[in-house]
Curated annotation (Swiss-Prot):
A motif (DEAD box) lies at residues 280-283. One of its GO terms (cellular component) is cytosol. Residues 43-71 have a biased composition (Low complexity). It comes from Arabidopsis thaliana. Residues 1-85 are annotated as: Disordered. This is DEAD-box ATP-dependent RNA helicase 8. GO terms for molecular function: ATP binding; ATP hydrolysis activity; mRNA binding; RNA helicase activity. Keywords: ATP-binding, Cytoplasm, Helicase, Hydrolase, mRNA processing, mRNA transport, Nucleotide-binding, Phosphoprotein, RNA-binding, Translation regulation, Transport. Belongs to the DEAD box helicase family. DDX6/DHH1 subfamily. ATP-dependent RNA helicase involved in mRNA turnover, and more specifically in mRNA decapping. It is found in: Cytoplasm, P-body. The modification Phosphothreonine is found at residue 237.
C-alpha cells in the first residue's frame, strides 16, 4: 500500500519520512532527520537555552530549579533584564497612567474630552442660570462620563429637573424637542442607583424601539465609569435572549412598555425593588395604544416609587393620569413657544406630480449635512426612496413594517453618517437625536400640529440651526393655516435663494 496516499498534501511524505516543514513533528519513532530547532533571539532566548542545556539529570533537581525560576519571575524581574526590576516599574507606570483615578485631584484635566462644538446655539439651550454639573454633588465617576460625553454645563431643562429628581419627588416636565431631556432624567437615575445591589432599581419606558436603543446608549456612555449594568429590551427581538440576560445582574432597564410588561408577567423581570420609573415621550405613552400597558406595569412597582414624565406636548389625558399616579408632582414648563428658535420653516405650493422635481431642486440648492424626508404612508416611503436613488442621491428608508434587525441596521448606519438622506414615516419623529441633521422635508404634510412639531424637531438639535421645508398641495392649504395658528409659529413661503447662514452655522 502506498503510504503517501494516506496523508493529505503538506502533512507528511509517508509514515516516518523526512518533512522539510520545521513545525511538523512526526508521530512515528522512525524519523530519519530531527526537525531543525527554532531560531530564538534576545537575552531571554540565550538564557532560556542555557538553562535547558545545563538542566540537571535528577527530576527533583529540575523541579526545584523550575520553582526557583517561577518565584524569580513573580518578583517582577524580566529574564535578561536588570535585577532591580526597573523595566517592570516602567510598565506598571505606563498602565496606571492610562487609568483615570476618580479620587485624584487632577481627574478633570486628564479626561479624554471630545472636540468642543463651536457651532452657534440658540437661547433654547443657552438661557441658563449658570449652574455647573458639579453643583449637584454627583458621583465623581458620573461626572467623568458627563464631561467625556461632551456636556459642558446643564441646559435649562437639566437645571430644572436634575436637583428635583435627586430629592425623590415626582416630576411632570415639558420642554422643546432637542433641548437635553434625555440627559435630564438619565443623570439623576444613574446617580440614585446603588451599583452594589444587583436588582432592577430603575425603568425607562419609551414608545419606539429606535428611541429605546438610543436612550440605553446614552445611559451606557454617561455611566461608563460606573459599574452599572444597563439592559435594553424591545419588541421584535428574541424573548429568550432577554430572559437569559435578566438572569444576570441588571440595574437599569430601558425598553418599550409591551415587552417589559410581558417579561414582568412571566416573573422574569422583578420590579419590587424598582424605585424610579421614567416615561419619555409621555404623551405618546398615554395614547390608547400604550396607556393600558403602562398602567398595568405601574401596578408591579412599589408604592414608594418615583415617576418622572418628560415630553414636548401634553394632551388632556395627562391630567387624569397625573391625578391618579403622581404624588404632588413638580411641574416644569419651558414651552414659552412650541417650535425651536433655531429652526426656519418654509412652505412651497406644488402639485402632487411636481413633488419629485421640487425635491430634486432642493437637493441641488441646499447645503445638506443630513436630511430626513417624511411621508404619510409606508408604501410612499419605499417608492420615494427608490426615486431619490434613481436621481443619483444616496438614500436609506425606514418604516414600521421592516424587520427589526433591518431597522436597527439602517438607524445605526444613518446615525454614523453612512448616508445623507433618510426617508421615513412618523416612526422616526419621536426623540431621535442625530446632531448632523440640519434639514427636514415634509414630502407629505402632516395632518395635525403635534406630528408637525415632532417632525421639524428632528433638525436644529440642542440649540443648533435647522431648516424645515413643507411641500404643500391644494388640499393641504387649510392644514397649513390651522397648524400655524395652533403652534403660534410662522411658516413662510420659500424664497428663490435660501441663505446658508440660517441653517448651516
Amino acid at each position: 500500500m502506498n503510504n503517501r496516499g494516506r496523508y493529505p498534501p503538506g502533512i507528511g511524505a509517508g509514515r516516518g519520512a523526512f518533512n522539510p516543514n520545521p513545525n511538523y513533528q512526526s508521530r512515528s519513532g522512525y524519523q530519519q532527520h530531527p526537525p531543525p530547532q527554532y531560531v530564538q533571539r534576545g537575552n531571554y532566548a540565550q538564557n532560556h537555552q542555557q538553562q535547558f542545556q545545563q538542566a540537571p539529570s535528577q527530576p527533583h533537581q529540575y523541579q526545584q530549579q523550575q520553582q526557583q525560576q517561577q518565584q524569580w519571575l513573580r518578583r517582577g524581574q524580566i529574564p535578561g533584564g536588570n535585577s532591580n526590576g526597573d523595566a517592570v516599574v516602567e510598565v506598571e507606570k505606563t498602565v496606571q497612567s492610562e487609568v483615570i483615578d476618580p479620587n485624584s485631584e487632577d481627574w478633570k484635566a486628564r479626561l479624554k474630552l471630545p472636540a468642543p462644538d463651536t457651532r452657534y446655539r440658540t437661547e433654547d439651550v443657552t438661557a441658563t442660570k449658570g449652574n455647573e454639573f458639579e453643583d449637584y454633588f454627583l458621583k465623581r465617576e458620573l461626572l467623568m462620563g458627563i464631561y467625556e460625553k461632551g456636556f459642558e454645563r446643564p441646559s435649562p431643562i437639566q437645571e430644572e429637573s436634575i436637583p428635583i429628581a435627586l430629592t425623590g419627588r415626582d416630576i411632570l416636565a415639558r420642554a422643546k424637542n432637542g433641548t437635553g431631556k434625555t440627559a435630564a432624567f438619565c443623570i439623576p437615575v444613574l446617580e440614585k442607583i446603588d451599583q452594589d445591589n444587583n436588582v432592577i432599581q430603575a425603568v425607562i419606558i419609551v414608545p419606539t424601539r429606535e428611541l429605546a436603543l438610543q436612550t440605553s446608549q446614552v445611559c451606557k456612555e454617561l455611566g461608563k465609569h460606573l459599574k452599572i449594568q444597563v439592559m435594553v429590551t424591545t419588541g421584535g427581538t428574541s424573548l429568550k435572549d432577554d430572559i437569559m440576560r435578566l438572569y444576570q445582574p441588571v440595574h437599569l432597564l430601558v425598553g418599550t412598555p409591551g415587552r417589559i410588561l410581558d417579561l414582568t408577567k412571566k416573573g422574569v423581570c422583578v420590579l419590587k425593588d424598582c424605585s424610579v420609573l421614567v416615561m419619555d415621550e409621555a404623551d405618546k405613552l398615554l395614547s390608547q395604544e400604550f396607556q393600558p400597558s403602562v398602567e398595568h406595569l405601574i401596578s408591579f412597582l412599589p408604592e414608594s416609587r418615583q415617576i418622572l414624565m418628560f415630553s414636548a406636548t401634553f394632551p388632556v389625558t395627562v391630567k387624569d393620569f397625573k391625578d391618579r399616579f403622581l404624588t404632588n408632582p413638580y411641574v416644569i414648563n419651558l414651552m414659552d413657544e412650541l417650535t425651536l428658535k433655531g429652526i426656519t420653516q418654509f412652505y412651497a405650493f406644488v402639485e402632487e406630480r411636481q413633488k419629485i422635481h421640487c425635491l430634486n431642486t432642493l437637493f441641488s440648492k441646499l447645503q445638506i449635512n443630513q436630511s430626513i424626508i417624511f411621508c404619510n404612508s409606508v408604501n410612499r416611503v419605499e417608492l420615494l426612496a427608490k426615486k431619490i436613488t434613481e436621481l443619483g442621491y444616496s438614500c436609506f428608508y425606514i418604516h414600521a413594517k421592516m424587520l427589526q434587525d433591518h431597522r436597527n441596521r439602517v438607524f445605526h448606519d444613518f446615525r454614523n453618517g453612512a448616508c445623507r438622506n433618510l426617508v421615513c414615516t412618523d416612526l422616526f419623529t419621536r426623540g431621535i437625536d442625530i446632531q448632523a441633521v440640519n434639514v427636514v422635508i415634509n414630502f407629505d404634510f402632516p395632518k395635525n400640529a403635534e406630528t408637525y412639531l415632532h417632525r421639524v424637531g428632528r433638525s436644529g438639535r440642542f440649540g443648533h440651526l435647522g431648516l424645515a421645508v413643507n411641500l404643500i398641495t391644494y388640499e393641504d392649504r387649510f392644514n397649513l393655516y390651522r397648524i400655524e395658528q395652533e403652534l403660534g409659529t410662522e411658516i413662510k413661503q420659500i424664497p428663490p435663494h435660501i441663505d446658508q447662514a440660517i441653517y448651516c452655522q
